[in-house]
């Protein structure tokens, strides 16, 4: 966590490279290598490693938040998840050798988002008795706070889903299966007659907010702030174009790629794919953007071998995590 915080703050300060020049244990060197550090080609008595921070990639570590109790707190399960995460970091360093792979913890982002929301709403972070609600309401429209209530804050989720065409050539933002249409959900938000704090996990391509913004404006919803876990320079410019105030837990000026761990693991997560017939109850048609299911969009620039190793890592990690869940 300390390494992540140091690197993320350096990115916010527009640093281009990070250098490690000090004695280090094997565990520390392994941690640095999993972040993308490579040995410098210079003579040195101490370990000398550096990493290019100009176009970092982000890995969102969210398997623990995807699992439900009692598995999400089981030590054996968490050990398997941790081992899978380390393998994933190493596989990602092969995509862009020498470039920073910043691993961010979804639980840390979640708690910091909650703190920011209650501070904005002027309420304590712990439930009060009697219950006293702040004037603003929290409206998650991504995945990070879906199904969670913020202390002393009216919370209502806009349930959205990114749905890909069968050939994966395009995608649209639609209402999550079995929920009302997006305009109906937005009208429900409007009926609360409260200033709104919109919350999402990532603002980089801004696909969800681009789809929601016209509907929110049409219904006259008072958006006080767009609050996200990770904000890129592109996302900040998009919010400036939409004239929306924005804040974040992490700000990364230049973001090359982002990877959501659960979305890469088959049978644990994935992206929804549109089908002609209704899905089986309890099951949603989905796909993971890894081999052999699909060719990742970054395959041409990263090379076949790196993409193959990443896909293999995802398949093996999903097998190990699911196998541990079955045994527990």
What is each residue range found by the language model?
Residues 1-328:
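PRPP-associated nucleotide enzymes
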């Amino acid at each position: 966590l300390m390494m992540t915080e140091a690197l993320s703050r350096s990115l916010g300060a527009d640093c281009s490279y990070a250098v490690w020049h000090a004695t280090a244990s094997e565990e520390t060197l392994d941690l640095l290598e999993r972040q993308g550090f490579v040995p410098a080609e210079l003579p040195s008595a101490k370990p000398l490693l550096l990493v290019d921070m100009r176009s970092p990639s982000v890995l969102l570590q969210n398997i623990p938040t995807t699992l439900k109790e009692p598995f999400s707190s089981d030590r054996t399960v968490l050990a398997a998840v941790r081992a899978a995460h380390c393998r994933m970091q190493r596989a990602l360093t092969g995509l862009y050798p020498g470039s920073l792979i910043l691993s961010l913890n979804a639980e840390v982002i979640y708690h910091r988002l909650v703190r920011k929301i209650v501070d904005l709403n002027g309420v304590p972070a712990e439930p009060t008795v009697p219950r006293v609600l702040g004037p603003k309401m929290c409206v998650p429209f991504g995945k990070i706070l879906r199904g969670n209530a913020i202390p002393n804050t009216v919370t209502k989720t806009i349930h959205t889903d990114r749905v890909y065409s069968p050939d994966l050539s395009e995608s649209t933002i639609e209402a999550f299966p079995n929920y009302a249409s997006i305009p109906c959900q937005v009208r429900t938000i409007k009926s609360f007659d409260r200033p709104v704090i919109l919350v999402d996990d990532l603002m980089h391509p801004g696909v969800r907010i681009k789809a929601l913004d016209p509907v929110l404006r049409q219904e006259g919803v008072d958006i006080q702030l767009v609050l996200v876990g990770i904000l890129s320079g592109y996302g900040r410019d998009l919010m400036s174009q939409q004239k929306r105030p924005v804040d974040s837990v992490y700000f990364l000026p230049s973001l090359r790629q982002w990877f959501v761990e659960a979305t890469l693991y088959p049978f644990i997560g994935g992206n929804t794919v549109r089908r002609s017939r209704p899905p089986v109850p309890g099951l949603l048609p989905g796909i993971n953007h890894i081999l052999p299911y699909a060719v990742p969009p970054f395959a041409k620039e990263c090379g076949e071998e790196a993409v193959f190793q990443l896909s293999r890592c995802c398949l093996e990690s999903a097998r190990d995590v699911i196998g541990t869940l079955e045994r527990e």
